[in-house]
């Protein structure tokens, strides 16, 4: 384990404004990738990019407002859940799956860094940096805040960390048995003893069992669809939603629901939602599921599947079924989704636009507001509530 040294305390820290805690606290945090670009459908390294950053956003007000930005390594590669904020909004953990090769700035290579940011200091700052595995992407922390799991996309492993006093300590690494499994998203059930892990590369969802710092796998994996990716669990722990990204070839893609009340757990619904549904999120009350579809916005303009925008689709959750309620255009290369604590504001990351799309969600209707610029590509977004 390495604590953060001079890298964190020198020019790597960039603050927009001092972090003033809103009266009714409701923060979102975004992981912003500055080093990756998409030019006419080709993803590559940016030329002389500024540092990647984490933005801290006050969503207790409308429109939401960015109140601080801290330099920390991150990446768009992997599911848009590569950042986590503690329930008391005191610290953040963010992962980095890729970086520009220091000896060859024309190449992007796997990264393994995990950074911890203290939000209680003024200004907020990085206080620890530790390594996970190659392609460190998804970060999820147990409900009691004592155990963190990091999916290492480039090596097919899952890193296990203990969490105490805003510090991580490595306690193990689990080999998934397939270096091309591409583990993508992991989420704990409310009991803290069970978790789910999506495997984009071999089309599986694993059920994990947690006993202290020991993590084991159920021998029966779940099947949802082609390339299961982003994962979310509703507040009550009764349903999980999984985005099935498909092959990115223009075909319609899907979202599946997993019933968490039955033993064994099982997939109970799969519905077509759009093309490449990278982002998805349950509303705070669990009554709605928001899905962000890329819709070909990352492809070359010459592709027959190219669109100049993505789509945000909101579904009502009716038992174990989904019913479409509303749809609106969003920016290009859409990523993660977050709701405000009251469920009335929705934020969606758009990598190419370097901004968050902002919507009011009231009366079953989406009303777009002004985009919120975060300076570089918002690759992931999280709030403190589950």
Where are the regions a protein language model picked out?
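Bacterial N-terminal signal peptides that target proteins for export
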Residues: 1-11
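Bacterial N-terminal signal peptides
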Residues: 10-18
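Predominantly soluble domains enriched in secretory-pathway, periplasmic, or organellar proteins
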Residues: 21-386
């Amino acid at each position: 384990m390495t604590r953060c040294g001079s890298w964190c305390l020198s020019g790597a820290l960039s603050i927009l404004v001092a972090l003033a805690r809103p009266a009714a606290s409701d923060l979102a945090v975004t992981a912003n990738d500055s080093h990756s670009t998409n030019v006419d459908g080709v993803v590559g390294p940016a030329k002389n990019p500024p540092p990647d950053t984490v933005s801290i956003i006050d969503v207790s007000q409308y429109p939401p407002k960015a109140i601080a930005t801290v330099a920390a390594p991150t990446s768009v590669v992997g599911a848009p859940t590569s950042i986590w904020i503690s329930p008391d909004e005191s610290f953040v953990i963010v992962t980095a799956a890729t970086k520009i090769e220091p000896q060859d700035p024309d190449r992007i290579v796997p990264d393994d860094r995990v950074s911890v940011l203290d939000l209680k200091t003024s200004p907020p700052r990085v206080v620890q940096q530790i390594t996970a595995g190659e392609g460190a992407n998804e970060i999820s922390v147990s409900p009691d805040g004592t155990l963190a799991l990091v999916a290492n996309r480039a090596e097919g492993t899952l890193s296990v960390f203990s969490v105490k006093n805003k510090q991580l300590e490595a306690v193990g690494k689990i080999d998934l048995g397939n270096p091309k499994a591409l583990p993508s998203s992991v989420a704990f059930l409310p009991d803290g003893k069970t978790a789910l892990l999506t495997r984009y590369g071999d089309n599986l969802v694993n059920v994990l069992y947690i006993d202290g710092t020991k993590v084991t796998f159920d021998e029966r994996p779940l099947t949802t669809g082609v390339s299961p990716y982003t994962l979310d669990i509703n507040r009550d722990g009764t349903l999980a939603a999984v985005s099935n990204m498909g092959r990115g070839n223009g075909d319609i893609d899907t979202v599946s629901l997993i019933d968490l009340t039955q033993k064994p757990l099982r997939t109970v619904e799969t519905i077509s939602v759009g093309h490449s549904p990278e982002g998805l999120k349950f509303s705070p009350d669990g009554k709605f599921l928001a899905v962000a579809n890329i819709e070909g916005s990352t492809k070359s303009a010459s592709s027959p599947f190219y669109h100049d925008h993505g789509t945000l689709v909101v579904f009502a959750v009716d038992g174990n079924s989904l019913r479409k309620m509303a749809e609106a255009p969003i920016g290009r290369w859409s990523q993660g989704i977050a709701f405000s604590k009251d469920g009335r504001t929705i934020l969606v990351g758009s990598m190419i636009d370097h901004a968050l799309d902002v919507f009011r969600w009231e009366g079953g209707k989406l009303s777009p507001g002004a985009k919120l610029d975060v300076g570089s590509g918002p690759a992931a977004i999280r709030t403190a509530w589950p």
